[in-house]
C-alpha cells in the first residue's frame, strides 16, 4: 500500500494460489475506502492481508505507521480482520516472476503482482501441503 497506488490480489477458493487482481489509485482516504469496500463486497474475502513496508533493518518506520493507521481505519470501516505481512522485496520478486513468465510491466503492474507475492507468501505459510508423499 503506497502513497499513490494500492495493489490488490485475490486467492482462489481453496486458498492455494494468489493472483493479481487490480491496482487502485490512492486518492483521499474516503475515496480509497470506497474503492476497497467495493472490492470487498464483490469478492467477499474473510480477511485482508496488507503488506507492511518494514525497513531493511526490521524496524517500523514512518511509511509503515501510515499503512497501519489507514489499515486500522479500513478494518473498522469494513469490519474485517487485517493481517500484516512484511512486504520487503515483494516488488523485486514480482518483477522476477513477471520476467520469468514473459510478462512485462505493461501487462501486469508491479503493484498488483507484488500484492500477489505477499498473499502467496501468506497462503504458503498458513496452508498445509496438499499432497503428502
Swiss-Prot record:
It holds the Pfam family RuvX. SMART domains: YqgFc (SM00732). GO terms for biological process: rRNA 5'-end processing. Its main location: cytoplasm. GO terms for molecular function: nuclease activity. Keywords: Cytoplasm, Hydrolase, Nuclease, Ribosome biogenesis. It comes from the Bacteria. This is Putative pre-16S rRNA nuclease. It comes from Dehalococcoides mccartyi (strain CBDB1). The lineage of its organism: Bacteria, Bacillati, Chloroflexota, Dehalococcoidia, Dehalococcoidales.
Amino acid at each position: 500500500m503506497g502513497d499513490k497506488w494500492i495493489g490488490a490480489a485475490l486467492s482462489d477458493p481453496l486458498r492455494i494460489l494468489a493472483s493479481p487482481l487490480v491496482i487502485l489509485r490512492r486518492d483521499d482516504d474516503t475515496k480509497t475506502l470506497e474503492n476497497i469496500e467495493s472490492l470487498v463486497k464483490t469478492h467477499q474475502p474473510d480477511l485482508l492481508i496488507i503488506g507492511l513496508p518494514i525497513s531493511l533493518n526490521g524496524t517500523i518506520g514512518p511509511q509503515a505507521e501510515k499503512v497501519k493507521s489507514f489499515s486500522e481505519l479500513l478494518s473498522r470501516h469494513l469490519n474485517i480482520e487485517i493481517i500484516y505481512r512484511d512486504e520487503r522485496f515483494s516488488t523485486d520478486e514480482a518483477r522476477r516472476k513477471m520476467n520469468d513468465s514473459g510478462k512485462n510491466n505493461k501487462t501486469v503492474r508491479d503493484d498488483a503482482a507484488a500484492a500477489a507475492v505477499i498473499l502467496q507468501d501468506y497462503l504458503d505459510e498458513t496452508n498445509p501441503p496438499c499432497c503428502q508423499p
